[in-house]
Regions:
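Extracellular or exported targeting regions of proteins
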Residues: 19-196
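Positively charged n-region of N-terminal signal peptides that target proteins for export
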Residues: 1-4
Length: 196
């Protein structure tokens, strides 16, 4: 009985640690207005290969003075498997976990409420969105809906929409972890905040 109670308390503690983040959909270039009064941003990109012909894209830029998010750092991510090909077996990625640390909240979609994560579903590339974004400690796990899959021929696979968060910390390199159906989790070079 005591061990059952202990297990129950452990499960409750684990569940209490997981924190769902608020996700909103936005369009480009309108989202840029949160980060620059001119509604234009200059970005830097990092690419990490996935299964030879796919990649994880990390995008980073600093919000400009005079913008709602002035002084913060913007991090956007995208998984591109459009050219990952399978004939009898189509590989896919179900989630991406990044050691992000604390994120800053802003009104990304103009409804007056503060949000955690934005997904650029209009005005940009992609066809796969987010099912959820869940924080556990410093890690955030982004689960895709549906999974991001390769295709039966080049150009027939999926790409996620760009999805992003904001932090008060500048970037450093981290190893992101992508859960998939082809074997052990993929460990991918990415940018994320250099938080304490």
């Amino acid at each position: 009985m005591k061990s059952l109670l202990g297990i129950s308390l452990l499960l409750l503690a684990s569940a209490a640690v997981a924190q769902p983040l608020k996700i909103v959909t936005v369009s480009a270039p309108a989202i840029n207005c949160v980060f620059n009064p001119t509604c234009k941003v200059t970005v830097q990109d990092l690419s990490a290969p996935i299964w030879t012909n796919g990649f994880l894209q990390s995008r980073n830029y600093k919000a400009a003075a005079g913008a709602p998010a002035a002084g913060t750092y913007v991090y956007e991510y995208r998984i591109d498997l459009r050219n990952v090909v399978g004939v009898t077996f189509i590989r896919f990625i179900t989630s991406l976990k990044i050691n992000f640390g604390p994120n800053a909240r802003f009104d990304f979609n103009g409804d007056g409420a503060k949000d955690d994560v934005f997904v650029v579903t209009a005005g940009g590339i992609g066809n796969v969105g987010l099912l959820s974004a869940v924080r556990s400690g410093n890690d955030i796990t982004f689960t895709f809906k549906p999974p991001v899959a390769g295709g039966s021929a080049p150009g027939k696979g999926d790409s996620t929409f760009f999805f992003g968060l904001v932090s008060k910390y500048p970037r450093h390199n981290v190893m992101a972890v992508a859960a998939n159906n082809a074997g052990p989790p993929l460990v991918l070079n990415a940018w994320a905040p250099n938080h304490p």
